[in-house]
């Protein structure tokens, strides 16, 4: 832990054709398996243990920016899915997980899978929410408003509340009549399925 196992590079804008992600990682090797590595853990484990919780972000830059803002308990999955190996590393330090993946549909879906996996393995999960159309990720939020990002972390909602907000949105909807009822029923079924999978007795 704390040794160099790989590198990440950013595609320069003038060479970005849109055919690949903005960041390129070292190919996996016997010593670099992304599903077993949490970026920043060697720097964060003391703060995680002291605070009794971990902030899990998606990218390395998210983690770096969080640390620069004084959020020393942040680690990143390096853009890959959260895995059981990741959770085993974290479980040695805490079972309190605060999740903040990217604020796009792909990031939100990855966050859902992370919630389901973590709660199934006895983690208490809370989710940091960005309002639609605001920040795309933790790095952008920290750069724009460090105190505001800290406040969002403090306001992280329980996993079940996140699912209610995502699948049973309040306010007006573009659907009406029977289509609105069908949409609502679908949302209720989804939330009930998520609740069934949550293992925390508190939730």
Predicted regions and their residues:
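C-terminal or mid-to-C-terminal helical accessory/interaction module adjacent to the motor/catalytic core
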Residues: 124-202
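Histidine- and aromatic-rich ligand-binding microenvironments
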Residues: 96, 102-103, 154, 161
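Flexible glycine/proline-rich, aromatic-decorated loop/lid segments
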Residues: 87-90, 116-119, 158
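Acidic, metal-coordinating catalytic cores used for nucleic-acid/nucleotide bond scission
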Residues: 61, 82, 101-111, 129-136
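Short secondary-structure boundary/capping segments
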Residues: 70-74, 114-117, 142-146
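Conserved acidic, small-residue-rich alpha-beta core segments centered on
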Residues: 98, 110-121
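Phosphate-handling DNA/RNA-contact segment within nucleic-acid enzymes
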Residues: 1-93, 97, 110-111
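Generic hydrophobic alpha-helical scaffold/packing signal
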Residues: 45, 91, 115, 139, ...
